[in-house]
Amino acid sequence: MAATMVLDPKPSSTPPPTLPNPYTTDSQSTDSEDDLYTRLKTLDRQIEFIDIQEEYVKDELKNLKREQLRSQEEVKRIQSVPLVIGQFMEMIDQNNGIVGSTTGSNYYVRILSTINRELLKPSASVALHRHSNALVDVLPPEADSSISLLSQSEKPDVTYNDIGGCDIQKQEIREAVELPLTHHELYKQIGIDPPRGVLLYGPPGTGKTMLAKAVANHTTAAFIRVVGSEFVQKYLGEGPRMVRDVFRLAKENAPAIIFIDEVDAIATARFDAQTGADREVQRILMELLNQMDGFDQTVNVKVIMATNRADTLDPALLRPGRLDRKIEFPLPDRRQKRLVFQVCTAKMNLSDEVDLEDYVSRPDKISAAEITAICQEAGMHAVRKNRYVILPKDFEKGYRTNVKKPDTDFDFYK
């Protein structure tokens, strides 16, 4: 009996296995390779562009360096020629400004691009091109001024012991000048302001300038020495500017002492001036008065003035608040003459026969400078005679030479 075949009427739920499509995989791989290739080409183009930019920057840098060298050479060439000294007045913009020349004229000028604009302040000293008046350099504050500080090596070696007599004058000037600078707290505790200025006055040769030299030697403060006639300059405005420079320099180096010798050259009593020179001197005096009693007064700057003609000075200068202390240097009396003779002959090789008291007791009115000249002339007379010892006749010769003058001498002073 043949076997019968039974067919399952329900189909199987498991799907037949399928094979991967080789065409689909190749297409995706090709797309990925195309993307990578495109990115590679893009990066290559970017690298090439960056290389081109780098070469351009290098070339531009070389050009700028050459331009910089040419500009530096041009600046050196401009600054190498003689320049005109001027004064900066006002900044208009970053490239232009107004300057004043020494002739009194003001100019609207171009400012060199290499100049530091922060240095361009009013009243600053500048250098101008001689032809175009362009501002090419800024000078140091004291470059065009004859005023300068005395360094430690330049300070005189005069001490208080080298000045015979003048004990009262020494004490007064030390109280008015040295003590406020070294012990200012003493004045604060007492509740007073120290003197601002000191006037030394008296006949010629009585030790005014020498005492100021001793002050300069004994103090550590900056010392500025100027003669009154130095403020009188050729062009208008130069004198008052020098006065401002002196006080500015003193304030920058405070504590400082300003010594103005022969102050009567600029501080005579004011009058109705008829000439430009007289008006300029009066402007110098007014600037001096303002600097000594201005709004920006500082206690660390002391002023010493010396003159032979205190009677001609302007009353505004002599008032308290400017010159608080006035120290007189009279002709030496008998005791003062003895001290001056002792100081002058301390290092001299005198004979035992020399009696200095004889010259001290003589009634002639002589100054300390004349006593120094007597001792010097006595030494010169001994040298002329080839002697190493000074005899009484040498002193007598020196005394007659400097004191016993004929009445006909120096008639032009009368």
Curated annotation (Swiss-Prot):
The keyword Kinase appears for this protein: no
Disordered, as annotated region: 1-33
Functional description taken from the UniProt entry: The 26S proteasome is involved in the ATP-dependent degradation of ubiquitinated proteins. The regulatory (or ATPase) complex confers ATP dependency and substrate specificity to the 26S complex.
SMART domains: AAA
Keywords attached to this entry: ATP-binding, Coiled coil, Cytoplasm, Nucleotide-binding, Nucleus, Proteasome
Family, per entry: Belongs to the AAA ATPase family.
InterPro entries: 26S_Proteasome_ATPase (IPR050221), AAA+_ATPase (IPR003593), AAA_lid_3 (IPR041569), ATPase_AAA_core (IPR003959), ATPase_AAA_CS (IPR003960), NA-bd_OB-fold (IPR012340), P-loop_NTPase (IPR027417), Prot_ATP_ID_OB_2nd (IPR032501)
Record-given protein name: 26S proteasome regulatory subunit 6B homolog
Gene3D superfamilies the UniProt entry points to: 1.10.8.60, Nucleic acid-binding proteins, P-loop containing nucleotide triphosphate hydrolases
Keyword Cytoplasm: yes
Binding, ATP: 202-209
Induction of its expression: Down-regulated in response to mixed metal ion contamination (cadmium, copper, lead and zinc), but not in response to zinc ion contamination.
Compositionally skewed regions (Low complexity) per UniProt: 21-30
Pfam family name, one: Prot_ATP_ID_OB_C
Residue ranges of coiled coil: 55-81
SUPFAM superfamilies: P-loop containing nucleoside triphosphate hydrolases (SSF52540)
Major location (coarse): cytoplasm
Subcellular localization(s) per the UniProt record: Cytoplasm; Nucleus
Superkingdom, natural source: Eukaryota
GO molecular function terms listed in the Swiss-Prot or TrEMBL record: ATP binding; ATP hydrolysis activity
An annotated GO cellular component: cytoplasm
